[in-house]
Amino acid sequence: MANVYDLANELERAVRALPEYQAVLTAKAAIENDADAQVLWQDFLAAQSKVQEMMQSGQMPSQEEQDEMSKLGEKIESNDLLKVYFDHQQRLSVYMSDIEKIVFAPMQDLM
């Protein structure tokens, strides 16, 4: 029987080798090399963190915060580097979702 940890490490290497993963890495590097994209990226991460904290504490963003997030979303959509990043990230997430279903299938059997 194969060692489960060896299989998990092999899966990690396989994910890193996916063209979709490599595309996300390339897109991320492009963002890091562009000052405007990097500022928008940092703004996005801060907004995402703020929303997650609010939701975890049972709060909803105010209308003003929602408007700010919409404006940030529009800025992100208009930035080609960030748009490419999120497009590649979406493609990679399809793989990750499929892998998650496969890996957690045995846990579903126990429910």
Curated annotation (Swiss-Prot):
The residues that cross the membrane are none
UniProt similarity note: Belongs to the UPF0342 family.
The record's annotation in Pfam families points to: Com_YlbF
InterPro entries per UniProt: Com_YlbF (IPR010368), YheA/YmcA-like_dom_sf (IPR023378)
SUPFAM superfamilies tied to this protein: YheA/YmcA-like
Give the protein name, as stated in the record: UPF0342 protein gbs1446
Top-level lineage group: Bacteria
Q: Which residues form a coiled coil?
A: none
